[in-house]
């Protein structure tokens, strides 16, 4: 829509996959659909991040967000250390490859801490989104480690 200016596609893989998290913050994301990112694996410390891993896959939801909304979202204290990178994801429904941004923690921050509550919430969400059962278990395992 005109009034928001430029839009970006973002591959969300953490709790922001829940659109209501974003709409409660006053954002207006347009859901494009579930997708998979090859060559990365999920890691849950204090929050979720993706780490490069040749043989792995991470699942998420692609949404379109106004650039200014994305900037506002990632300027919040809990997520402002995340850095955007350019990725190509595959939409699960069509197999179409699309370019998107993905926000990850820098490697030196990625492994800090462990939040079993976050892991539990994210595994519940991943299950509700009907992601691969093995992937749901991979997320849930982070909750059992802490």
Feature roles, as predicted:
Residues 4-146:
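Glycine-aromatic micro-motifs
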């Amino acid at each position: 829509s005109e009034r928001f200016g430029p839009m970006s596609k973002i591959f969300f893989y953490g709790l922001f996959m829940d659109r209501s998290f974003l709409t409660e913050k006053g954002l207006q994301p347009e859901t494009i659909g579930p997708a998979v990112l090859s060559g990365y694996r999920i890691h849950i410390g204090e929050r979720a991040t993706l780490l490069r891993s040749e043989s792995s896959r991470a699942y998420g939801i692609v949404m379109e967000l106004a650039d200014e909304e994305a900037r506002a979202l990632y300027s919040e204290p809990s997520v402002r250390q995340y850095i955007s990178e350019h990725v190509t994801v595959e939409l699960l429904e069509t197999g179409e490859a699309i370019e998107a941004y993905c926000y990850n923690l820098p490697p030196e921050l990625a492994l800090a801490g462990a939040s079993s509550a976050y892991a539990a919430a994210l595994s519940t969400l991943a299950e509700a989104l009907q992601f691969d059962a093995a992937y749901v278990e991979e997320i849930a395992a982070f909750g059992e480690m802490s």
